[in-house]
Amino acid sequence: MTNLKFGVALPYVSAREVAELCTLAEETGWDGCFVGDAIWCEDPLIGLAAAAMTTQRIRLGTMIIPMPLRKPWKVASESLALDRLSEGRLILGIGAGAVWMGWQCFPDEVTDTKARAEMLDESIDILTRLYRREQFDYDGKHFHLKLTQMDLQYFPPKPVQQPRIPLWTPGL
């Protein structure tokens, strides 16, 4: 016997439509509802926050937040808030990002594949430590962070899901 689960991937739609479609997916028996992240679309975490308020059971996930375009500490704060709001139903899909998805419009963004992969690795390390609310210094190749105990008092609480929010990353 397997524990196979089924999720639905939503098209790029508004936050209100994400909430409506996730509610419909839950009502029709789906196990998960996933929202993409593209440069020109609404932020998936906003849509999933709306969905967290209209659903009770279905898992809510991103596919796939390109970490080279985000600061890991901001993603940590946002995902911790969404994990609490959804009562532990968040799956955080993150990746290095697909350069063909509009990055050419932003000449300051990192397009080198190796550098983007390094940024993803560093982001995973930082996210994991922030989810544990550790005091730490991080001096990576791409990200630098000095987190004191005083800083931690303002950072969101640990995630509902332990030991951390599930992090999914694609492989191509």
Where are these regions (language model features)?
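Glycine-rich loops and low-complexity Gly/Arg-rich segments
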Residues: 31-36, 57-61, 85-89, 116-120
